[in-house]
Amino acid sequence: MAIAFRASGPIDTVTANLGLLAELPGTFIGSGFNLISRPAKQHNKPFFLELNATHEILQFMAIGGDIPNRGSGQNDINLHGVRYLQQVSDCVEHSQIHIEPGLWLHVPETSDPQAGESYVRQALIPHGDSVLAQSTFFTTVNGGPQIAPVASTPFTGQIPDLNTPPATPITDPAYLAPFTDTPLPTECLPQGLNAAQTIKNPALVLQAAIAGQNIIKTDVISISSAPAGGIVNIPFVVQNANASRIDAIFWIETVRRPNGQAFIQLQYVQRVILDFIGIHWPHISVATLVKQ
């Protein structure tokens, strides 16, 4: 029996169609920080604040050809993209805390619907969650990234954008105490971080990681599940800690060493909103990864 395969195009042709994803194929390794408030009914508490210094391996592989989407209101389009596997472990205990396969896609401009070029991230989370997030902003800038604060304070009411503080933060001292009293992990984080300030704004870990670097170019992709897409969860997750929204910014940086050589570095900040006991709880992850 004959088996037909779709042949991959030349690598320069494949990467030329990836847009801002072109530098991703390969393996990125580095470290980061994870903050999550999770339910703790089993221990007779409303929640538990968990902090992890992390070690991460993020592997990207280019999809070797066109991904045709057939049109009925306009001509067909071709998507292009990369598949990825993200593996995150606790840097102190060396236990795995996250694994995520997924896709990044580069979508061309369309007329039906009328929409500009965009990027899409699809992810599978082994807690029973499927994610679809689309770009809200992307650009290329000279120099390094502008990393704005990302608030970890739990809140009620409307979910703000990633870099906007919540309008109605929780003020109960019993709920806020872990966000000021919990020590940071003792290993794998940049030196000199203030614990309370870092818990309040985990993006400080990203700023500390690139202090003193000569970043000459940065590709920026901001994504969210809010405008289009979303998160689909199994019923247990919906009832106990519903993942309702994801927002993230990825910075793909070209860094120049003092000897003139350059390397590629990936930084990201991601916020997933978990909803339980009537409160929105930001689950924030950051990392700085170097392409191998």
What are these regions (language model features)?
Residues 2-292:
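Soluble ligand-binding/transfer domains with enclosed cavities or grooves
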